[in-house]
């Protein structure tokens, strides 16, 4: 006696309620529904601030040196820019950080660099989830704390005079 496989399969499908065409239609509907997507991103300025704050926390860093625009803005009294001396390149999952610093005389630049690198990487990763793949630090100047304090006192008093505050 010959058994017709198609009839047996059809009978089984009818019994279990499974129909290949229905299954294919359900699959197509699932594929057509819009897929939920989301994205968290950060502006370069946010990463610059995080890196700038972290770098300033390291002992031996007296100040972060900015470029021309930062120097002009600090001459008008707004020298509390935490991203001064920091530039970054930010991708979707990674960031690269460049720092310009003034070191305290007598401190070890390689040790400070390691501390800065570790802290910047740690803080950027914790706050944003981004991996810092590169940290470059350029030492723009070396000063004693006394020299640095005197320089800052002079610049603050001249800023106050310019504003008529003295």
From Swiss-Prot:
Originating gene: asp23
Domain of life: Bacteria
Stretch list, region Disordered: 1-40, 144-166
Cited Pfam families: Asp23
Protein name: Alkaline shock protein 23
Organism of origin: Staphylococcus saprophyticus subsp. saprophyticus (strain ATCC 15305 / DSM 20229 / NCIMB 8711 / NCTC 7292 / S-41)
Family matches, as InterPro entries: Asp23
Family, similarity comment: Belongs to the asp23 family.
Function statement: May play a key role in alkaline pH tolerance.
């Amino acid at each position: 006696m010959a058994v017709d496989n198609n009839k047996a399969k059809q009978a089984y499908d009818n019994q279990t309620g499974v129909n290949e065409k229905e299954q294919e239609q359900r699959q197509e509907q699932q594929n057509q529904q819009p897929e939920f997507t989301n994205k968290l991103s950060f502006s370069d300025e946010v990463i610059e601030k995080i890196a700038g704050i972290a770098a300033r926390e390291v002992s031996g860093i007296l100040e972060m040196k900015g470029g021309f625009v930062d120097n002009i803005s600090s001459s008008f009294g707004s020298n509390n820019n935490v991203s001064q001396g920091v530039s970054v390149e930010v991708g979707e999952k990674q960031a690269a950080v460049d720092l310009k610093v003034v070191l305290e005389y007598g401190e070890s630049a390689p040790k400070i660099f390691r501390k800065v690198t570790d802290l910047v990487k740690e803080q950027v990763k914790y706050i944003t989830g981004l991996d810092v793949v590169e940290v470059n630090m350029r030492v723009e100047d070396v000063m004693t704390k006394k020299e640095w304090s005197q320089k800052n006192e002079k610049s603050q008093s001249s800023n106050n005079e310019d504003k008529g505050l003295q």
